[in-house]
From Swiss-Prot:
Record family assignment: Belongs to the dicarboxylate/amino acid:cation symporter (DAACS) (TC 2.A.23) family.
InterPro entries noted in UniProt: Na-dicarboxylate_symporter (IPR001991), Na:dicarbo_symporter_sf (IPR036458), Ser_Thr_transp_SstT (IPR023025)
Cellular localization per UniProt: Cell inner membrane
Main location class: membrane
PANTHER family membership: PROTON/GLUTAMATE-ASPARTATE SYMPORTER, SERINE_THREONINE TRANSPORTER SSTT
Disulphide bridges, residue numbers: none
Membrane-topology descriptor: Multi-pass membrane protein
Annotated function: Involved in the import of serine and threonine into the cell, with the concomitant import of sodium (symport system).
Keyword Transport: yes
Gene3D superfamilies noted in UniProt: Sodium:dicarboxylate symporter
Record-given protein name: Serine/threonine transporter SstT
Amino acid sequence: MSLFSCAIKRYKEGNLILQICIGIVLGILIGIFSKDLAIFANIFGALFTGALKAIAPILVFILILTTICTKEFNHGSEKIKHIIFLYIFGTFLASLSAVSISFIFPVELVLTDIEKASTTSPAHIGEVFKTLLFQIVDNPIHALSSGNYLSILAWAIGGGFALRHCSNDAKQLFTDINEGVLKIVKFIVKLAPFGIFGLVANSVAQTGAAGLLSYIKLLIILVLTMFFVAFVINALIVFAYTKKNPYPLIFICLKHSAVFAFFTRSSAANIPVNMALCSKLNINNSLYSISIPLGATINMAGAAVTIAILSLAAAHTVGIEINFLQAMLLSVLAAFAACGASGVAGGSLLLIPLACSLFNIDYDIAMQVVAVGFIIGVIQDSVETALNSSTDVLFSAICSDNELNLKI
């Protein structure tokens, strides 16, 4: 095996988090000490962003269409229906919290060509809905090529419901296409260290410390919001449902589920850990055997927080004023989009343009925000997954008929 082949193999098998960290450090050093080299390195960043721009519309369309077309959500049990409601309601409250916190602590990012973006926001409800309706009825081919995510979303939902009763062979075809698109996405994300290296080098060379400080502030807001959801929103939901002190159960879920999910960065990979924890908690086996795998698919509070905060950061950066109606629409849209983000590498980040389209933010600007998300994703994605996965156990526990064992 040649030296080049060995290097590629070691890179493919390497730890992505460590590789991204190395890319960030090298990017900072290049940006500080060699502006010319940083400008050249930006080619990697531009290629990475371009690849994301190309695949994101196709991913959203295929992912949502396939999910609606193939998933069966009617499991019969009333308890399962309660858990599904809690998953969706909790995700919406997380999104609403993120929107509220973004208004209290607005974050502006250092982006390029922000003059491209729309800097006006419709003032009246009629104008908002008129804009939305005309975006929705766009030609689907044009929507995919131009990144009109509202139209993509509408056609994907319509197509998904229209195809729910198609043959199993047809559904399998869509599932296979979906898997193919996901493999392409995983390949692009595997190249993230090179793209992030170029983006960080160029950002440091062009803006100095200002760009990095805006990233750090954004990351702090994201992490604190997810902590707020874990310790306040989830606590209120548990208390409302059980009328008992929620924190002993919350701390058990965080200790035995969130810690593992933080390092695996995958809700699906954490399913065995969660099921073992449910068994220790004495939750009904017939309940958690369905609710835990289902939660790994649709319970995405952390993803909703990411989508909402980064979308509003884009709006604040380009100077768009968001009214109350648009804020509520964003909360709903972020929650809905988050439910389709499972199983996709960087899924919540790739759905940010969908939310940005609500504010007429230029597609290129939205993809720059996605790139920023990948830069801070080393921590953001880990905390997001920890919140998502631990909440699966939390909501399963409060819906269980059995006496919970909290002495573990």
